[in-house]
Amino acid sequence: MSIPTRKIGNDTVPAIGFGCMGLHAMYGPSSEEANQAVLTHAADLGCTFWDSSDMYGFGANEECIGRWFKQTGRRKEIFLATKFGYEKNPETGELSLNNEPDYIEKALDLSLKRLGIDCIDLYYVHRFSGETPIEKIMGALKKCVEAGKIRYIGLSECSANTIRRAAAVYPVSAVQVEYSPFSLEIERPEIGVMKACRENNITIVCYAPLGRGFLTGAYKSPDDFPEGDFRRKAPRYQKENFYKNLELVTKIEKIATANNITPGQLSLAWLLAQGDDILPIPGTKRVKYLEENFGALKVKLSDATVKEIREACDNAEVIGARYPPGAGSKIFMDTPPMPK
């Protein structure tokens, strides 16, 4: 089977990518041996659009990928995305957001060093501080492209206004947002992120396309999440919201059974059916789930099934914020105007 694809800039990548975050952050520990095995299996499958960040494991994720490049010699097979924006105070360990041009250059050089490469395919602003005008940020990133250190520029969790202003300075190749049957906020007219991306021919890269695993049907109680797992803190998965939100999962499970696929594959196939500009990046630490997720590329949903899932989403009331208090304030961020 030829692998369905999506466009990032002038490049063609698999229509389902691999989110590397879970190897080092949010969902508990994983061994180096297991991480390297998953990366190799992803490459062998043809799942070669990888997504990292300098924040995942505070550099450990990039270093792990760098070791894989060095050990396998397969750098050229991978379209690699990573991100900057979070700065860690070396003395206090406190995190803050920094989008200033001098910090961008510093963060990029550190990422290149950790990865052991001289150019990153797609470099995202991970989160916005709300203090630096997007025009300044894009100007700095444009210089990084011209220097040959990055190939394409991406944004993440920003406002529609920020997307439009950014695209007026230099092409934006991807915007990364949470998008799934469980999180449809980007479609809302008052948020307008999907509309802004489509106006500017920007690929929408979807993180947490399985609702952080919730849409797979694997979790039937809040107690099913391991100790130290991010979902134990996120409001959407708390006891007071969990069972109400599970109603949508139950509907998706039922539709998946009728189509002889897993709930996760149904969710991913439904996302892909939303447009040729939609590119989900599910993450996992296990080869079994990697194969299941990438297998969603073989699924072709009927128009009736796509409509049935849309109706289930429309009739579901998803309750609880995506992030714990504090972190959620950096969602759909705007940036200040350029000083006159």
UniProtKB/Swiss-Prot annotation:
The record marks 83 as: Lowers pKa of active site Tyr. Coiled coil: none annotated. Substrate binds at residue 126. NADP(+) binds at residues 208-218. Monomer. This is Aldo-keto reductase yakc [NADP(+)]. It is an enzyme of class 1 (oxidoreductase). The active site is at residue 56. One of its GO terms (cellular component) is cytoplasm. One of its GO terms (molecular function) is aldo-keto reductase (NADPH) activity. Keywords: NADP, Oxidoreductase. InterPro entries: Aldo-Keto_reductase (IPR050791), NADP_OxRdtase_dom (IPR023210), NADP_OxRdtase_dom_sf (IPR036812). It holds the Pfam family Aldo_ket_red. It comes from Schizosaccharomyces pombe (strain 972 / ATCC 24843). SUPFAM superfamilies: NAD(P)-linked oxidoreductase. Belongs to the aldo/keto reductase family. Aldo/keto reductase 2 subfamily. Its EC number is 1.1.1.-.
